[in-house]
Regions:
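Topology signature of small-to-medium multi-pass alpha-helical membrane proteins
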Residues: 1-150
Length: 150
């Protein structure tokens, strides 16, 4: 007879915070892909970037870069939800997110970013996304090995 592994309290905390964090990324992705003018104008204003520069940058993405961005965003969101559902596939979703993040990062590094977008804050935020996603993948793997995720 198999004994059920008790769900540790930290899984719920990490899962809820991760889902909220990644829901923010999913919202940003959706608003950007649908070219929501109010959202993009506010984002441009908050970043101190001209609206035309921001919209020009996002509309210049090739399809493959958009695809990697989608993998990163939706993989991370799925991983967070799967973590709350105690599914071992949470780890796999976070790996998909890391692949998407790698593709998006390679595109960004290989692109001539408009000077207004190429700020230290943008690179710091990218690093934060890498760290958070990597830690979530590690956590999901660890919880799978402990039998918490099935």
């Amino acid at each position: 007879m198999e004994t059920a592994t008790k769900t540790p309290w930290h899984l719920w905390v990490i899962g809820i915070v991760a889902t909220l964090w990644n829901a923010g990324g999913a919202y940003d992705y959706t608003m950007t892909q649908t070219r929501n003018e109010d959202y993009l104008r506010t984002a441009a204003d908050n970043a101190g970037v001209p609206y035309d520069t921001m919209i020009g940058y996002y509309t210049s993405f090739p399809a493959w870069a958009d695809a990697f961005w989608a993998l990163g965003v939706w993989g991370a969101f799925a991983g967070s939800v799967l973590l709350l559902l105690r599914s071992r596939f949470s780890f796999h979703a976070f790996v998909v997110a890391l692949v998407g993040l790698a593709g998006t990062t390679l595109y960004t590094l290989g692109t001539d970013l408009p000077a207004e977008l190429n700020s230290p804050m943008m690179w710091v935020f990218s690093l934060i996304i890498w760290v958070v996603t990597g830690l979530l993948a590690w956590y999901a793997r660890r919880m799978t090995k402990k039998g918490v995720l099935r």
